[in-house]
Amino acid sequence: MKLRGLYAITDSQLLAGRFLSHVEAALEGGVCLLQYRDKSDDAARRLREAEGLMKLCERYGTQLLINDDAELAARLGVGVHLGQTDGPLTPARALLGRQAIIGSTCHASLELAAQAASEGASYVAFGRFFNSVTKPGAPAANVGLLEQARAQVKLPIAVIGGITLDNAAPLVAHGADLLAVIHGLFGADSAQEVTRRARAFNALFAS
């Protein structure tokens, strides 16, 4: 599977009361990867929501990933995204199998990206590139890092952190394969606007 396009990431608080409707609206507009991100301890709700997302993703032909929970990913037969505090990728790869999509947060570090690649990552994620509500204290990345990564890392590159339709185009131009977006997509007032934004993000890869 070619990993290129919009990488939508859910936020349970942002999507409260409109979770599945807004996610389906994004899928309608076109999503390469969908990450279920929920940091709560409510395991039953997380399983229920992840199962609902899996059904939607199957309908739209989108790959689902679970944030920071390889066991839940294995239970559902989907991929996982791991941060730097979640341990090495090797156990997750052993648990999920060779075909699973496994992503790794690399902040602004080419060294972390090289390590992730050696451990079997499917893609690496750099960021934050702009001010981010979700990760305000994350190390800053820039297009110079992106260009270096493009030359050195032989994996798809995701970019994250405050990405909107107003600032995403230069990231694609400098080598980003995946635009990882939360508020810039799901912060829309209506499902129709979510779909419009998804299509507009994808259009950046067609030009």
From Swiss-Prot:
GO molecular function, one term: thiamine-phosphate diphosphorylase activity
UniProt GO cellular component terms: cytoplasm
Domain of life: Bacteria
Cofactor(s) listed: Mg(2+)
Catalytically driven reaction(s): 2-[(2R,5Z)-2-carboxy-4-methylthiazol-5(2H)-ylidene]ethyl phosphate + 4-amino-2-methyl-5-(diphosphooxymethyl)pyrimidine + 2 H(+) = thiamine phosphate + CO2 + diphosphate; 2-(2-carboxy-4-methylthiazol-5-yl)ethyl phosphate + 4-amino-2-methyl-5-(diphosphooxymethyl)pyrimidine + 2 H(+) = thiamine phosphate + CO2 + diphosphate; 4-methyl-5-(2-phosphooxyethyl)-thiazole + 4-amino-2-methyl-5-(diphosphooxymethyl)pyrimidine + H(+) = thiamine phosphate + diphosphate
Pathway connected to this protein: Cofactor biosynthesis; thiamine diphosphate biosynthesis; thiamine phosphate from 4-amino-2-methyl-5-diphosphomethylpyrimidine and 4-methyl-5-(2-phosphoethyl)-thiazole: step 1/1
SUPFAM superfamilies: Thiamin phosphate synthase
Amino-acid positions noted as binding Mg(2+) in the UniProt annotation, renumbered to this chain: 68, 86
Cofactor stoichiometry and binding remark: Binds 1 Mg(2+) ion per subunit.
Enzyme Commission numbers on file: 2.5.1.3
Record NCBIfam families: thiE
Family assignment from sequence similarity: Belongs to the thiamine-phosphate synthase family.
Role summary: Condenses 4-methyl-5-(beta-hydroxyethyl)thiazole monophosphate (THZ-P) and 2-methyl-4-amino-5-hydroxymethyl pyrimidine pyrophosphate (HMP-PP) to form thiamine monophosphate (TMP).
Name recorded for this polypeptide: Thiamine-phosphate synthase
Species of provenance: Pseudomonas putida (strain ATCC 700007 / DSM 6899 / JCM 31910 / BCRC 17059 / LMG 24140 / F1)
Native organism taxonomy: Bacteria, Pseudomonadati, Pseudomonadota, Gammaproteobacteria, Pseudomonadales
